[in-house]
Amino acid sequence: MSTLPLLLEIGAEELPSSFVDGALAALPKLVEGKLAALRLSHGAIHALGTPRRLAVIVEGLATTQSDLDEEVLGPPETAAFKDGKPTKAAEAFAAKLGVPLDQLSVVDGDTMTSKKPNQKPGRYLVGRRSEKGGAARELLGRALAEICGAIPFRKSMRWGTGEATFGRPVQWLVALFGKDPIDLIFAGIRSARLSRGHRFLAPAQFEIESATTYVEQLRKAHVLVDRKEREETMMGRVDAAAKALGGSFVPDQYLVDENASLTEEPHVVTGSFDRAFLELPREVIIAVARGHQKYFSVEDAQKNLLPNYLAIVNTASNPANIVKGNDRVMTARLSDARFFFEEDKKHGFPRWNEKIGTIVFHVRLGSVKEKVARIVKLSAEIAKLAKVDETTAKNALAAAELCKSDLASLMVGEFPELQGTMGQAYALADGKDPAVASAIRDHYKPVGADDDLPKDDVAAIVALADRIDTLTGCFAVGLAPTGSADPYALRRNCIAALRLLSEHPHFESLRFSDLIRAAYKQFEWKKPADLDDTATVTKISEFATERLRGLIGNKTSTAVADAVIAGSDSALEQPAFAMMKAASLQKVVGEPWIETARAVGKRLRGVSKDAKPENHDFAKDDAKNSRIVSLVHTLDASTRDLRTTGVEAALLSFENVAKELGTIFDETLINDPNDPLTPKRLELLSYGASCMLRIADFSRLA
């Protein structure tokens, strides 16, 4: 089959960095879906882009569609014929396919290859649709225009008198199939082979020869259109500039992503500021450079900041002027930060603790000061339940009292990302215990699902109390997430709480529902009249169970997560134990005996589903039942205290039990209606099924 490369370039006014990143992520799927709908085979799809252009190159695109020959499901026979004659439904179906009625047939729906989702049993009218593949060139113009209009942006705009929308006004279009132009019109612009280079270094229009020369032609025009190449070039120059200063740049993926999406040919200029500003906390200086300026900070081998920064610019012309302006802005921003720092130290925690009373956490849940009071009480309860030592408990309460104070500081008001960090700095300056100061900073951890947890008990206690308070309060007043909307980040808070409970060593024995009930007591005066603590615990538990399922699934597999969650109603109560069971189960899930265990688990629950679980015994001379008794007793003994005996030991024991039970099921009539011992046998097997569930629901391991 003949193939050619395809190029589409959309030139636009400057796109924000987030628009570029989002479009580059979406383009390959958009193109792949459109080509699949057109029955056009293709090779690799490459999304390229800068602030001034979005492009896609498709390798090895077929020049001709594949032929179509498919079976098409029509209306049910009962709707297609009446009194042996075709109805309008049958005629419409034939017209849709473009075939005469006598070329349609009636078949059993179960034998069809083109079944519909949720198709009901019965006989259906079917036909075949055939179509010769057409030339790709005749189809691509419209398809590419549709792709242009489907690119998602956080905010799209219209301009002029047109109806098309895009992230920014479109300036030019290039569409080439091989070396030949594709006729494409989008947003009132007709495509050609004329592209544009760097706005300042190569502003003249030039012709693109083909998709295969596109990247190199733009490179010569001072545009690195491949984002990966642009990023590597940029960071190579950043690294070289930092080394020239005798240091290294402070790693920051946000700055890498942001600057790579803000430039077409990135260059680095080195700026500096007064060394006196280095008296400010390291995090403040980095925040100033990082925030509006998007500069990289530089540090020496001892991780001490140097009085320099590295700015990414889109042109290397006249660097002295660029540095002069950048230095002036950096100095002004650092001067403001120094003023905030000195003023904050004058007033300190007593004043902030009063001011947070004027900051609303949520109109239905009170102020931040009220939230802090709840965190303090809940921290005391967690410290008690976790049985930490007296010093840790004392420091946890002290940290809880101060954990949100810096929200009222001038510095955090200007740099919200420094919440907690400034609290630590001010606490140390005020002579607070280092453990308390660190907890003020670390109680915000983990921020994301994969971020580090607080390392010490003090911070972990306050972090858990904060998350549980937020979860309980929002659910108690009816602010649970709906669909994809989660304005109060309850999913993130829940995941953080579950990770703390499952990964922090002193929290393994804490029960999730106990914490929710302890937190709920502080909201009784705010809760809706028709909501009690049991309803709140139930709603939060259902919500948290799904989050726990996801956490377990990420570490093991979806099947293992389903098996562990379904196996025990208490999985959520002690997430650490659930995680341990899942990890042990994952180690053996691929072994041959697991399939036997899955089948046995399913049959056990099937034959005994209506029987009450009872650990019966039988006469020793009753060979059939005594064998079952022995196996169930083995199951019971190996799973009764899994924390002591170990899950892996129980699984090792269960391997033999599963095989023997499988044999018994194959050789014995378990539910014998003529055997007077059948009811007791079923109750015993029901008990065996409950023993299996102590580990997991093996029937879920499909």
Describe every region a protein language model picked out.
Residues 1-702:
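Amphipathic alpha-helical "coupling" segments that flank catalytic cores
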